[in-house]
Every structure is written in structure tokens, then in C-alpha cells.
Amino acid sequence: MSEEKRKMIAGELYRPNDPELREDRLRARHLLHEYNHSAPDAKAQRQEILKSLLGEAGNAYIEPTFRCDYGYNIYLGENFYANFDCVILDVCPVHIGANVMLAPGVHIYTATHPLDPTERNSGLEFAKPVTLGDNVWIGGAPLLIRA
């Protein structure tokens, strides 16, 4: 694991143009393309893609389209359901409990940027983890960030 990847996952300032991180994002994009373009009845294929993409997938069901940065920082509990257009920017870990339901258009962002313009212009970024407990339902089109 590169030092930049370690810092990213730990919530420290890191450089997102690190070669390993670029490759990880590309891998996720390929898997997401395959997932989002799968046939509506391809449940087994979708589950296999989620198992390859996510840190923990359980028996999740996610309606396409789904987007994330890396995938491996997303940990889903049992009986997770996300409706259309879910976005999880998983720069830091995202832990979601059991029996969680997300309505259409839910966005969960761990990524953020330094507030100081000099630091921000240097290209550094950081993130903070997000955790949702068990039995949560989130209505349509909210933006969840950890500030």
C-alpha cells in the first residue's frame, strides 16, 4: 500500500494523483460500468461485481446507476438497499449497518478539501469517515457529509 493511500484511508492530507490511487479509481470505474450496464435480471452477476468492488457487500441490492470512488472503503450490513442514482465518495471508510434503505439520489461524501486556499491549491485533499447505524432509512436526494 502506498503512503498516499494509507494517508487517504486514515483521513490525513494526501495527494489524490498517486499512481496507486489512480489505478484503484480506474478499477472501480470499470466495475461500475459493468454493474450499471448489466441486464435488469442479472442479480447474480451484480452481486458478484459488488463483492469484487466493495469492502463488504453482504446481500446488498443497489439499483443502477451507482457511483463510488474506490469501493473498497464501503462496508455494507445485511439487507442494504439503495435506489437509483446512489453516490458514495469513499475516500475514507463508509460503514452502513443492517437493514438500511436509501431512497433515490442519496449522496454520501467522505471527501473534502482544505479550507485554506494555499493548502487547497497545493492539490492536497482529505476525508472523514461516515457511519450509518442499523435500521436507517434516508429519503430522496439528500447530501450526507461528515464535517
What are these regions (language model features)?
Residues 1-59:
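Terminal amphipathic alpha-helical/low-complexity segments used for targeting or macromolecular assembly
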Residues 58, 62-67:
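Arg/Lys-rich RNA-binding interfaces used to dock onto structured RNA substrates
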Residues 66-76, 81-147:
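Flexible, glycine/small-residue-enriched loop-and-beta-strand segment within the central core
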